[in-house]
A protein has these predicted regions:
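N-terminal "assembly arms/tails" that initiate or stabilize quaternary assembly
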Residues: 1-95, 349-374
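Core alpha/beta structural scaffold of self-assembling particle/tube/pore-forming proteins
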Residues: 3-23, 27, 111-374
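Short, solvent-exposed loop/turn segments at the edges of secondary structure
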Residues: 57, 95-97, 226, 335
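N-terminal, well-ordered alpha-helical segments
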Residues: 58-60, 64, 100, 123, ...
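Structural recognition of the beta-strand scaffold that forms the well-ordered cores
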Residues: 61-63, 103, 230-232
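Short active-site-adjacent helix-start/loop capping segments
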Residues: 69-73, 102-103, 111-112, 336
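Short acidic, glycine/tyrosine-flanked loop/strand segments centered on an H-E-D-like triad
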Residues: 84-113, 307-318
């Protein structure tokens, strides 16, 4: 009986597998699946710009707007001539091609069918893209590559597509501990992540900026009518927070998650550690770590991200293509080796306004990896 196979590079196979890479990213990606929205009025920490799906270009321009500041016109006072100029700021996120090639081996090694090789290739490519997107978005929001040893890009990495990392400004950076630390250089091993730091971030988010100040006011993401900030912490910061609170205190935080989140918030609160004062606490393995803090520049630390709306932007897509990602199969060495290439066009950037971060606080704390091994 003749064997039924799907020919390599067939249109049906390419469309199916390129679409599946995008679906996997949306379902399993940390930022993509939970904290991303598009449109003119995004309501999530990551704003996805869809312009690349409609037109070509090496950059996408986006706009940020501040609150109105002027006084109203009262009584019979003439209103004409008192119009207030909208306080908007535009910025560019540059985009570039991003591709990854995987070799499926040579014909001597191929004991599987072509369909099986596509399945394996798709799974590995999806895992890779999910990891790359998660690491990249976290680096941009953190404004640094950090010293994480398990990242795809090495520690000399400074960004993709001409979009450089932007370090946190002094208005949007806070430090752990009792409040004595005023910089990463003055952090000590005792300045760990705790609820006091979260309380400070909540208070600052509610009081800083807006109105007549030209400082962006952090806006809480709104999920089903409920405003909830997002705090993304590193696993070691989670460990320190649990130790600080003890079983009783931690039970109260997890109880708030169980009783305070409804089904419509499932993506936003899915896998959360808890809810504290309407802040959803999430842990992310790709949280940025450092090993050069403290007075001696040897203190290990981690940067948590306290996020509001439009903390960062992601431009993603391929104009004129049905799928976000491309999928190309090619035989090399006279039909001896099969290679599969997945690619897209993208750009990532932290949103800033006049040199100030727009929607994120950096919460820097000591975070000693040896504390979880001893």
């Amino acid at each position: 009986m003749a064997q039924t196979t799907v020919a390599h590079s067939s249109v049906q196979a390419v469309q199916r597998y390129s679409a599946m890479v995008a679906v996997d990213l949306a379902r399993e990606g940390y930022w993509n699946s939970k904290f991303m929205s598009s449109g003119k009025n995004p309501a999530m920490p990551i704003w996805r710009l869809t312009d690349l799906e409609k037109m070509r270009g090496e950059s996408v321009r986006y706009y940020l707007s501040l609150q109105l500041r002027g006084k109203p016109v009262q009584g019979g006072v003439k209103a004409e001539g008192t119009a207030e100029q909208l306080d908007t700021y535009s910025d560019l996120v540059y985009v570039d091609q991003l591709r990854k090639v995987v070799s499926c081996g040579n014909t001597n090694d191929q004991q599987k069918t072509m369909l099986e090789f596509r399945e394996i290739g798709r799974a590995r490519q999806s895992e890779y893209m999910i990891r790359l997107f998660d690491e990249t978005i976290t680096m941009y929001l953190s404004g640094a590559r950090g010293t994480n040893t398990d990242f795809i890009e090495d520690t000399a990495f400074t960004g993709y597509a001409n979009n450089s990392f932007v370090a946190p400004d002094s208005y949007h950076q806070m430090f752990g501990g009792d409040g004595s630390a005023t910089s990463t250089a003055t952090l000590t091993s005792d300045d760990k992540f705790g609820l006091k730091l979260l309380d400070k971030a909540i208070a600052k988010a509610k009081t800083m900026g807006g109105g007549t100040a030209r400082i962006p006011k952090l806006q809480a993401p709104k999920v089903n009518g409920k405003k909830r900030f997002l705090c993304v912490i590193h696993p070691i910061q989670e460990f320190d927070l649990r130790r600080e609170q003890g079983e009783l205190g931690w039970a109260q935080i997890t109880k708030a998650l169980a009783t305070g989140a409804n089904d419509s918030e499932s993506n936003y609160t899915k896998d959360a550690l808890g809810i504290y004062r309407d802040v959803v606490i999430q842990v992310h393995d790709a949280g940025i770590t450092f090993n050069t803090w403290g007075a001696a520049s040897t203190l290990p630390g981690a940067r948590a991200l306290f996020c509001g709306v439009q903390a960062g932007v992601l431009a993603l897509g391929q104009p004129g293509e049905a799928n976000t990602f491309s999928w190309k199969e090619e035989w090399k060495d006279f039909q001896y080796v099969l290679e599969i290439c997945t690619g897209t066009r993208w750009g990532v950037k932290k949103a800033t306004f006049n040199g100030l971060d727009f929607g994120v606080f950096a919460l820097d704390t000591a975070a000693d990896p040896t504390s979880i091994t001893t």
